[in-house]
UniProtKB/Swiss-Prot annotation:
It catalyses: (R)-pantothenate + ATP = (R)-4'-phosphopantothenate + ADP + H(+). Its EC number is 2.7.1.33. Belongs to the type III pantothenate kinase family. Substrate binds at Y68, G72, I73, D74, R75, T144. It is an enzyme of class 2 (transferase). It comes from the Bacteria. ATP binds at D5, I6, G7, N8, S9, N10, A11, N12, S92. This is Type III pantothenate kinase.
Length: 209
């Protein structure tokens, strides 16, 4: 079974247990003889995907208890296997969603870590810097690189901590493992979105035929 999670920069695939990533340009050239079950948040690819007979869109099959308007299918899929907890998907944006008794209580969005860098560099060339991923969040910074890093990482940390209260934290996405290290008992699951997709297919076995 081939699953595909299409974003704005990349398309991530899970082929049984084999995980791989294609750029959007590579994805447009991708050919396969078996069915591909996908979710997609890339507006530019919607027409292309409609014309691909082997591609099966899973989005219409998700029944998700939320009053949030415009919740992305990637966020829905990431939350779909979680009954209670906070789901953090840390990619080009960082999304934080709160689930209680399988009900989505709401969520919020931050820039991704790479985009914080771009924001700083647009403010001033002097703020163009790599981040110090080892910066202490328990001591005030004494140089610009650490000050930028502290501002980003401590801000993200405090917002997630405040949202989590005593709930379990589930991290996914490219920066998910890094952010999970700031929290005790956090779970990093690279395949969280794919688990949601697999659950949908299990609930709708006719999709396989």
């Amino acid at each position: 079974m081939l699953l595909c999670d299409i974003g704005n920069s990349n398309a991530n695939f899970l082929d049984d247990n084999k995980y791989f990533t294609l750029s959007i340009d590579q994805f447009l050239e991708f050919k396969n003889e078996q069915k591909i079950f996908y979710i997609n948040v890339n507006e530019h690819l919607k027409e292309h995907l409609k014309n691909q007979k082997k591609f099966i869109n899973l989005e219409p099959y998700f029944l998700f208890d939320t009053i949030y308007q415009g919740l992305g299918i990637d966020r829905i899929a990431a939350c779909y296997t979680i009954e209670d907890g906070v789901v953090v998907d840390a990619g080009s944006a960082i999304t934080i969603d709160i689930i209680s008794n399988s009900i989505h209580l709401g969520g919020f969005i931050l820039p991704g870590i790479a985009n914080y860098k771009k924001i700083y560099s647009h403010i001033s060339p002097r703020l163009k810097s790599e981040f110090n991923t080892q910066v202490s969040l328990d001591a005030f910074p004494q140089k610009t690189m650490d000050a930028l890093s502290y501002g980003v990482f401590k801000g993200i940390y405090l917002l997630i901590k405040d949202a989590a209260q005593n709930k379990k934290l589930y991290f996914t996405g490219g920066d998910g493992q890094f952010l999970a290290n700031y929290f005790d008992h956090a779970i990093y699951d690279k395949l969280l979105i794919f688990r949601g997709m697999k659950k949908i297919i299990k609930e709708n076995p006719n999709l396989l035929y």
